Structures are given as C-alpha cells and as structure tokens.
Amino acid sequence: MSKAWGGIGIGAWADEAERADEEQAAEATAATADTQSFPSLREAAAATATSGKSRKMKKMSLSEFTTGAYTAPGGRNSVGLTQQEILQLPTGPRQRSEEEMQPGRLGGGFSSYGGRSGGRIGRDRDDSDGSWSGGGGGGGRRPYGGGFDDDRRGNQSRVSDFPQPSRADEVDDWGKEKKPLPSFDQGRQGRYSGDGGGFGGGGSGFGGGGGGGGGGLSRADDVDNWGAGKRQAPVRSSTFGSSFGDSGQEERRRLVLEPRKVESGGSETPPVVEKTSKPNPFGAARPREDVLAEKGLDWKKIDSEIEAKKGSSQTSRPTSAHSSRPSSAQSNRSESSGLNNVVKPRPKVNPFGDAKPREVLLEEQGKDWRKMDLELEHRRVDRPETEEEKMLKEEIEELRKKLEKESVAPEIKESDQEPGSNNNHNDLPEIIRGKEKDLEILTRELDDKVRFRQKPVERPGSGAGRTGTYSERTHSRAGSIDETRSFESTERPRSRGAVDAWVRPANEQRRNFQGTKERGFFSNRSSSREGW
C-alpha cells in the first residue's frame, strides 16, 4: 500500500516538530544571552543597585591587571601556540643568494621596476603571507586587494594559519617563465586596469592572475629602456592608466609652415589687407587727418584757426548784462589754447536761457530799481509818516505840477513870464531831484532808527530819567519834535484805552523795581500790565 506522504515514516513529522522546537528554544536562549550581555540602562542600574552590596572583592595578579584579561580560577586554558609551533617559527630573515641580492637582476619581485626597496617590499609580502599570490599557485582570479578580502568572508577558510612558502622562493628567475606581451599599447593600458599586467596579473591585487609563474606580464621585466620602443604618435586610450605615459607633445601634430618669401626688389610693397565679408560701419569714410593730408593742408593749423575763431566769438558776445565787456582772462585763455592746439570744451549752456537781471529789465522799461527797492524796504518798517516827510512830498508834487504845466503850454508861459523868472523855471527838474534825495535820506534815517533801535532795558535807579530822553534832545532840523513823538509812539505798547505804562511817574516805577531785586525785565512787564 503506497503512502500518501511520499514514503515518509510514521514518526518523521514528529521528529521534525521536535527539531523545530529545539531550534526555537536555542534562538530564545541566544536572544536572552544577548540581552543579558547588553542590558538596557534601567536594567543595568537595577542590577547594580541590588548586587552592589552582595558583591565580593576578587583578587587578581599584576599581570592580569596590566593586560586587562582576567580568567576565573580553574579556567586557565592555554590558547597560544604549542611548543612544536613555537620551534617552527623563523628566528631571522632567510638567507638570500648573491644573484637575488643584486638589484639589477630580474630575480626578485619588482626589483627592476622600483629599485631595491620595491623588491624588498614585494618579497616581504610574499614571505609573510601566501594570500598575495592568488592562492599559492596563481591559478584562481581574486579581486583587487589580495588576501585582505579573505578576512572579511566567512565561507572561505584558509588551509592553515601558518605562513605558506612564497613563490619568490620557488622561482629564481621570473623572466624565463613570463608570457610574451601581445602589443606595446595593451601592456601600457593595463598597467592599472588589470587586463595587461601592470603590477600583477589580470584581475588580482599585486600577485598572480591569469595562471603561470608569478603574474609577470609587465614590461618592467622585459624592457630596460622604455624610450627605445616608443612610437611617434600613439593612440590615446580612454582608460585611466594611459594618462601617465602619454604626453601632449607626442599627440600634437607638427605644424608644417611654408618658407618665408622675401622679394629681391629694393622697395617692399605694403602687405595687402584681406577684405573680410563683414561690412564696415563707416563705409568709405576715412579719418579727417588723412583726407586733409592728401589735399596738402595742415590739419593742425586749421584746428588752431577754428579754436581762435570760437574763442573770439565767445569773448565778444556777452553772456549777461553784468559781463558785457570781454574779460582779459578769457581772451588770454582763448589765445593760449589756440596756440597750444588744445581742444577746448564746449561752451556751457546758460541754464536761465535769455533771462536778464531784474535791474536791467527795469532800466529798459524806464523805471528806477533803486527807488522801488527803497519803497519796498520802507513798507517793511511799521511806523507812521512824520510831518517833515509829508511837507517834502507836497513840495515835490507841486513842483511836478508846475513842470507839467510848463511842458503843456510853453508859449503861453513864456509870454506871461517876467524877464527875471526864466532861471527858476529852468531849474525845476534839479530842484525836484534835490527834494527827492532829501526825502529819500530822511525816510532812510527814520527807518534805520526804528529798525536798529536799542530796546529799552530799565534798571534800578535809572528809570527816572528815561521818560524824556528823546524829547530832551536838541534837533537842528525842523519837525524833529514830531519825529521823536512818532518814535515814542512806535515804541509804546498798543493798549486799549488804558493808562500807558511808559508815562507813569518815576516814583511808581522805582517802587516796582525796589520790590524784588531778583525779578528782571519780564517780571516788571507783568506787574505793569496789571493796570491795563
């Protein structure tokens, strides 16, 4: 009777179940062991708190303390080498033959390439570990790095922990067993890429690769002088190793220049400039100096004449009314610039255009700008008109009326006039000018007195004689009393029909000043205003 489970025994599934349970239990114990070896911070703190008191002190030797390796009693098992292994260890360097000691011979690893030191390094590595040579026989391919990669792999195991015999000891001359190179370029390309044999065989680290004896596919063991077989223009390869041997001068093509042609004739013709297809932005135009030189003219003289004309026109034309006459500095400057052939800058444009000063415009209109300015200044001064000013204005008006009447009917006036009165009528314009000057001087003096008068600052003991200072002055001119009165009226504070503080008796003013010596002018004014 055939079994449905394919021949599996009756208790096979039970065995498998038990085996699975055992594996799970082993995994659980491993997990707990890991957690015990690496507990959390809380568990470690709790464990130290509980077991800190019950923990006993342990004795250890000085060697154990210095090395840091403590072994429990009863567990001192020897892990080091046995006595037989210790006796097999080398006591010194291996004895080399005379041929191997010569640096120029092809006996050691890379002895001819890198000198004596390079060969020694290769020999030491071959003697120390057999992993450099690709498994001892050089049969299998290994990645770049040699035996260092074997330590990282867990599947591959070494044959023995003891050092294997080096291929450098087995082979005396690597040059006899090396394979011929296919081409020069391939050997140079594979120096670092690992296909043509730079420092080793194809694919291995520094040791053998591609079979054979010692990975000796390098041209360092074959050719002593690399410059002998060098080509003129080698093909540049895209690999990394080719950039070290190639140079820019080998790849660059040599320029083939035509020989220089020198004509036998005595006169050398100027070189013909090749015309380009790009159009000239100036067309057929040429410099002004070249054109004038072809016509036989001196362009320097022409420029100096033009500059002289410009300077004369600028100096002759007045820029404003104040500078109607040409200044000597400008004329001298224009002459010197014309002589020195210095290009003068363009004349500055007047920002005001054709605008003229106010005085010039008023004179063109027949007005006296001085009288207008005086009248404007007089309006700024706030003072009443004096009697003397009124009288002078009336006299000037009467004289002007007489002058107008004489100009309207001169014949009638001449018939009515007496023979002794001709001089008076002819002198009327001069008399009017004199009166106007007197009026102008008088108004200016009065305005200056009001404008530049000293403000009266009353001091203790001096207020008695201040009231009549302007009235007690002696004036030689008629109407001076009215002038002082008008001046006093301007200085008085304008009140609304109350008693004036400036006309108070001297005793009252003294009383105000003697009240407090600390109070000044403002305190006196405040007390005087109380009666307004």
Curated annotation (Swiss-Prot):
Residue ranges, compositional bias (Basic and acidic residues): 167-180, 249-263, 286-310, 355-365, 401-416, 472-494, 507-520
Main location (coarse class): nucleus
Low complexity composition-biased segments: 26-35, 237-247, 315-337
PTM (free text): Phosphorylated.
Region feature (Disordered): 16-365, 401-434, 451-532
Residue numbers covered by motif Nuclear localization signal 2: 237-244
Keywords: Initiation factor, Nucleus, Phosphoprotein, Protein biosynthesis
Family (UniProt): Belongs to the eIF-4 subunit B family.
Matches recorded under PANTHER family: EUKARYOTIC TRANSLATION INITIATION FACTOR 4B, EUKARYOTIC TRANSLATION INITIATION FACTOR 4B1
Identification of the protein by name: Eukaryotic translation initiation factor 4B1
